[in-house]
């Protein structure tokens, strides 16, 4: 039976940084059932005290010491949170002091700076990339001239979530093209993709996993039949090999890893927002 541990991601901003780092840490441990809670915009003493009370209550409820992954910049807020008795994991503390020494400069303790909308050009680039991903999802639009990348795969192999992640976190204009039965009759690229070979990246997936995903969407249909999944995946992989399209299996790969691999393979230099 898994051991329950309450985990809180506390931040003076969105909490994305704390949650991302915390999740990466927790995945290193098995045999635990982590009950997570993100507390965003804890940016004044009153909110910090409220957060502290919630953390203490969780410790009493589960009769175990809570874990807090904290990205609050203001140390006075961190001290209030520490009164909860939780294990405090400060996201920035291990790095700030060495950086201050190396740069011979004190940090600017700006609340919410990590995900603040500082650069309007960057903000609009992300919004435009998101709009592009939505309008070019599943082959809805096929004007690929402005695309940075075109993900190609059979249905339900992870194209859409990867495109959205690339747009939101990297400002990448990512389109995706679903391979149809007609496309898979040939081991050559569909005509509408042939002029964009350098933008293509293929996603594949284990047929058993694909069948599970499709079964949830359309139970007991031909679409979700295991033999259909095997045939489609095999045909897509032959096409990718014949056309020398870079390919990655999404079966045991996170969206973050898929996105990083796509960017590196296609030579797209983008910073994570």
UniProtKB/Swiss-Prot annotation:
Molecular-function GO terms, alphabetical: ADP binding; ATP binding; phosphotransferase activity, phosphate group as acceptor; protein serine/threonine kinase activity
EC number: 2.7.11.33, 2.7.4.28
Pfam hit, one: Kinase-PPPase
UniProt entry tagged with the keyword Magnesium: no
Binding, ADP: 153-160
Top class in the EC scheme: transferase
Catalytic reaction list: [pyruvate, water dikinase] + ADP = [pyruvate, water dikinase]-phosphate + AMP + H(+); [pyruvate, water dikinase]-phosphate + phosphate + H(+) = [pyruvate, water dikinase] + diphosphate
Keyword annotations of the record: Kinase, Nucleotide-binding, Serine/threonine-protein kinase, Transferase
PANTHER family for the chain: PYRUVATE, PHOSPHATE DIKINASE REGULATORY PROTEIN 1, CHLOROPLASTIC
Family that this chain belongs to: Belongs to the pyruvate, phosphate/water dikinase regulatory protein family. PSRP subfamily.
HAMAP family, per database record: PSRP (MF_01062)
Function summary: Bifunctional serine/threonine kinase and phosphorylase involved in the regulation of the phosphoenolpyruvate synthase (PEPS) by catalyzing its phosphorylation/dephosphorylation.
Protein name listed in UniProt: Putative phosphoenolpyruvate synthase regulatory protein
